[in-house]
Amino acid sequence: MSRKFISEFLGTFWLVFGGCGSAVFAAAFPELGIGFLGVAFAFGLTVLTMAYAVGGISGGHFNPAVSVGLTVAGKFPAANLVPYIVAQVLGAVVAAAALYVILTGKAGAEIGGFAANGYGEHSPGGYSLLSALLIEIILTAFFLVVILGSTHGRVPVGFAPVAIGLALTLIHLISIPVTNTSVNPARSTGQALFVGGWALQQLWLFWLAPILGGAIGAVVWKIFGEEEKAGHAGSVQPAKT
């Protein structure tokens, strides 16, 4: 368990440091800023790279909503759920702390939104609580469907991190203007702790919605994605002679 715990810590650290770091330092850098597109790709690349790096050790969750969804789907033991979530939150908080120290090392730097997630007046596009709730549930549900589908035994081995990384990129392209994109309670927690105030007050939504979405995605996958007991749906059957 210690190797898995460390892997989840490192993977979530890299996700927050790379994804939120790109938003904090590079998104609006004068003349050369990477914008929403660059931030979206940064988040996708963090998951892709760490899934290959440590996914073979821990499964590469890096996200409490993913761990909950996989548990609901019967793909992850419930006994390991709390240790995984603890490792993920710790990784996110340590990454946020590192970003904070780096940011405040610049003369005249202001923490601002610090890539925290929010709704209402703290949504990048001014979207309501209901909008934030719906988009986080829907996108996390589809994220779990992609994860469960791409890691299924009938899919060629080795391509899952690519599909999952691209899915997370797409998720960010859709929802950065709405909530700054969470779909990951650990990622939201790390940033909120250093912003304080409104970010902590709104943090509940970025635990509730992704976890609910993850569970929904898992149930949807179990209904249509799993092979039937009597046979292998979608598999090639030998020709009769």
From Swiss-Prot:
PROSITE patterns associated with the record: MIP (PS00221)
Residue interval(s) of motif NPA 1: 63-65
Motif position, NPA 2: 184-186
InterPro entries membership: Aquaporin-like, Aquaporin_transptr, Aquaporin_Z, MIP, MIP_CS
Single annotated GO MF: water channel activity
Annotated site location: Selectivity filter: 43, 172, 181, 187
Taxonomic superkingdom: Bacteria
Site annotation Involved in tetramerization or stability of the tetramer: residues: 20
Record field: catalytic activity: H2O(in) = H2O(out)
Transmembrane segments: 23-43, 85-105, 129-149, 156-176, 204-224
Localization (cell): Cell inner membrane
One GO cellular component, as annotated: plasma membrane
One Pfam family linked to the record: MIP
Membrane topology (UniProt): Multi-pass membrane protein
Keywords annotated in UniProt: Cell inner membrane, Cell membrane, Membrane, Repeat, Transmembrane, Transmembrane helix, Transport
The record's note on its domains: Aquaporins contain two tandem repeats each containing three membrane-spanning domains and a pore-forming loop with the signature motif Asn-Pro-Ala (NPA).
Family listed: Belongs to the MIP/aquaporin (TC 1.A.8) family.
Alphabetical list of HAMAP family matching this protein: Aquaporin_Z
Complexes and interactors: Homotetramer.
Job description of the protein: Channel that permits osmotically driven movement of water in both directions. It is involved in the osmoregulation and in the maintenance of cell turgor during volume expansion in rapidly growing cells. It mediates rapid entry or exit of water in response to abrupt changes in osmolarity.
Record's protein name: Aquaporin Z 1
Protein's organism: Agrobacterium fabrum (strain C58 / ATCC 33970)
Gene behind this protein: aqpZ1
